[in-house]
Amino acid sequence: WRFVRARDGGAIASFGNTGLGYGVPGNDCTTGGGDAWITIEIFRQYGAEGKDILGDAYYETVNHYVSSFDMTDLGAGHTKTVQQWAFMGDPSLKIGGYD
């Protein structure tokens, strides 16, 4: 939490696993789901999709994950990835601040 509580700065929120993050090694890490996919997706939602409100970016990220992978395949770890990927912060805040 040092990056969140840094004096004269710090983060406004944090996204991450509450448990062990699952992933696919190698080039498939961006296509196979798991921690790498969902972590990259939050940045895609912000940068490419323009979701600059934290809660909206988080919602769209999880929604896109759930619609992209088979949530009934428990062995693949997709359900666990979504359940363990937590957002800590105020969902109403705007990324980059307000003008």
Q: Over which residues does each language-model region extend?
A:
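Active-site-proximal C-terminal subdomain of hydrolase catalytic domains
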Residues: W1-D99
